[in-house]
Amino acid sequence: MLLRIAYCDDEIENGKKIRDYINQLMIQIEVEFELDFYVSGTVLLENVKKQNDYYDMVLLDMEMPDMNGIEIAEKIRELVSREVLITFLTSYPEYMQQSFRV
């Protein structure tokens, strides 16, 4: 089974670190995966609209210029007809409660 993952973070250096970590982890646990990296929530949502039900997991940064991770997650929930695992990556504790309602 192929695990399809989207990761969205406007900070490219953070994105590279997380991408490298995911690559190492998936190889270590022997899971076949595909990882797409986005620097814009708008671009991620455009691709989700085009390819409904494509991603199994979405990793979102909370603070981005075009929209925050909560807004992106809410739109993904509206667009995708099946359950997608959404995980937020942030150092802002004030977003913790908000993330549970998505």
Indicate where each model-derived feature is located.
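Short, well-ordered amphipathic alpha-helices
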Residues: 15-25, 44-45, 72-77
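A generic structural motif
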Residues: 26-35, 82-84
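A general structural signal for stabilizing positions within well-ordered secondary structure
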Residues: 27-29, 49, 78
